[in-house]
Amino acid sequence: MHPLNVKDWRHRVMIGLLVCLISGSIGVTAAGSVALRDTKTRQRADKALRDGDYEGAEKTYRALLAKDPHDHQARLGLSLALLKQRHLQHAYDHASRVIMAEPLSARAHALLGAAILASGDFRNSVEEFRTSLRLQDDEAIAIAGLAMVDFYENRLESSIRGLRRAVALDSKEPDYLFNLGQATARSEQYKEAADSYERFLAIAPKTDADRRDRIRGLIDFLRYLGNQASLYDLRGANNTSMTFESVDARPILKVRVNGGKEYLKFVLDTGSGMSVISEETAKKLGLRPVARGGMARAVGGGGKFEIVYGFLSSMELGDVKIESVPVYIRHFYDDRYSVDGYIGLAVISRFITSVDYGDNTFTLRRERKLKTDAQVGFGGSASPARDEKGELTTSTAGTLEIPVRTTSSGFLSGEVQIEGIEQPQNFIIDTGASITVVSEKLVEQEDLTTFVEATRMRVFGAAGVAEDVKRVLLPRVVLGPFVREQVSAAVLDMESLNETTGFTQSGILGGNFLRHFRISFDFQRGVVRLEPLGKTAKRSINGNAEVPVVE
């Protein structure tokens, strides 16, 4: 069962639309008279929504609907209140009920699209957003929704344009400013990002203290970054190749930082946007925090860890040197095999990055910059990628390109098919995790309990240690055309993590899946390339990952 039941609803809406068009009944409804009688109640609900009292707003909108179930304005308000609380199925249901009665409601289609997008269904969400804009071309929710699709699929210029327009249309909606801050920060426009977050704090509800603390710390960090001449400056060679040690199916590279001669051990971590360094190593290097504030969401322990920002003058990977590297500083819980840090996507995103689990080699290859927003699309609908000279680029012969997205929190996400589940699921592609993960929610919704094994696990995560973790043996896991059978996966609560991903992640593809391939990450074009290994592939140390790490 898909989390949002799109197919049956769409059939009913088409019938409803046909009936309405034939009868000529689209127009003024009974909701108008109800709105006049209940003006004060409606104003109270709208104020609660603006003030961040989403439960109070929900209660008041439900009271209006109890008086008149045909009050579509109240039902749309209820849908938005539920969406803000991430009650996605209920938000979807109420928006679809309005569309059944008023098929030409632009706001209803926009809210439906927003709920579908948050659930991770991009194709149907785009259809709803476009329908909304055909009905009303200044519907801010739909404009912002399409902009976020662009953001997740790494079309940053288009995303920023759309979010700026949404802010101009509805300057009182804090989420648009927050999302604009995210998009401009990712495109390294740090001043505009900090300004957007400042404006967000000025109008956002005061109810979420942790989120506000997190953003204040982020603003301080962005101001600091804005004072730097530039970030992630590339020095040295354009290409490098180096061997890595594989521990628990995680690639561990020898890295030098801040011009030091000593090699440090860093895990290649495509499950992190920014690089991370351990508190202990930061202390050895004399690395001090440049900003801090709020709690980050992650797997393990209580699902959160304190956000502390640092800054490295340089990081050397083989013959490649990257200068001015922002990092997180945090405690590492796994004491079985000590590492100094994790290399995040921002460090390697200017290269085609290859990980060969067969012969344990890591390669960086710098290519010409593509024209902005040139991506390989999901479903193959995008234009071919071209470099800055307008020339077509080509992929490596004999490999298959699989489109990937980037979450709000900077994780790499791909569509995965699991046997027994009809709809594809969004999974984080994480070289820093030793084992695959499925969310507790997915196990419950899709009745995967029949695959639960008797043994329990202990899992180390960024937010702490999770004890007595269930494990499922998935019969088939499919990424693109590639299939792995009998994939062991830890069952973890991912709800805290999904608070900041933007669209729902149902699991993590970890090392016990990825180690069977040669993988190339082409970040400019938004694809990964997979090539299955032969039978001669080397096995990693502790390849069964009996004590897994999910960082």
Predicted regions and their residues:
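Bacterial N-terminal signal peptides
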Residues: 14-25
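Solvent-exposed, amphipathic alpha-helical segments
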Residues: 41-48
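Pepsin/retropepsin-fold aspartyl endopeptidases
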Residues: 30-35, 43, 55-59, 63, ...
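Short amphipathic alpha-helical segments that mediate assembly, nucleic-acid/protein binding
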Residues: 10-11, 15, 211-215
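Active-site charged/polar residues at nucleotide-handling catalytic sites that mediate phosphoryl
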Residues: 52
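N-terminal secretory signal peptides that target proteins for export/translocation
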Residues: 1-10
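Compositionally biased, intrinsically disordered low-complexity regions used as flexible
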Residues: 1, 24-32
